[in-house]
Amino acid sequence: ELVDKGMAAYAAKGIKAHGYVCDVTDEPAVQAMVATIAKEVGTIDILVNNAGIIRRVPMHEMDAADFRRVIDIDLNAPFIVAKAVLPAMMEKRAGKIINICSMMSELGRETVSAYAAAKGGLKMLTRNICSEYGEYNIQCNGIGPGYIATPQTAPLREKQADGSRHPFDSFICAKTPAGRWLDPEELTGPAVFLASEASNAVNGHILYVDGGILAYIGKQPK
C-alpha cells in the first residue's frame, strides 16, 4: 500500500517510477530484487539505505531477540543491500551509496542501546565501504538527521492539556541551537548533493543535518 501511494505521488508529478517490495534482511531476496531491477530498469547507480527501526527499552530490560532485530534491520540490512549493488558499480567504476545514520552514531541516550549500537556500526560501515571501494570511483557517505517534525513525532510536539509544551519538545528545542524541530524537506538538499557529481570528492563522510545539536553544549545558566 505504501509503495502504491509512493508510485501514485511520482506519477502525479509526471515522473516514471518502479516500485518493489523486499525484506532487506533476507540476502537471497535482496539479490533477486537487485537482479530484477537490473533486468527491468538497469543497474543501480544510487543506493539509499534508509530502512530502520528503533526499540525504546532500558538495556537491562531488553530482550536479546529485540536487540538482534534492531541490529539486523539497521546495520545488517545496509550491508546486505550494499553488497548486492557493489559488483555492478565496480564494473561501471561509478556509484553512490548513502546510508541514513543518526546522531546516535555519535551520542548515547537512555533506552536506545540497540539503535545506537546499530547506527554507530553503520557509521563505520560507511567509512569502510569508502576505504575499500573508493578506487572504483564509488562514494559512500551518510546522513545523520536530527529531530524531524513528522507525523510520527507530532505527539511529542503537541501542547499538553494544561497548555504547556511537551517535556520532550522543550528538551529538543533547548538542545538545538536553531531552537526548533527540523523540517523533512531540509534533508532533501544533502541527499541530492551526496547523490550527485558535486560530491565526487566527498567519501566516507557523515553529514549531520541536526540543526547544530552535535556542536552545542547548551546555554550557560544565567
Model region roles, listed by residue range:
Residues 87, 131-135, 200:
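Alpha-helical segment proximal to the catalytic Tyr-Lys
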Residues 79, 94, 180-209, 214:
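C-terminal substrate-recognition "lid" of short-chain dehydrogenase/reductases
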Residues 59-61, 107-113, 135-136, 179, ...:
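Active-site loop immediately N-terminal to the catalytic Tyr-X3-Lys motif
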Residues 102:
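Residue(s) in the substrate-gating loop at a strand-loop-helix junction
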Residues 82, 118, 126:
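Active-site helix of classical SDR
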Residues 58-59, 66-71, 168, 172:
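Substrate-binding pocket helix/loop in short-chain dehydrogenase/reductase
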Residues 48, 134, 139, 202-204:
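Short, small/polar-rich loop/turn modules that mediate ligand/substrate recognition or access, typified
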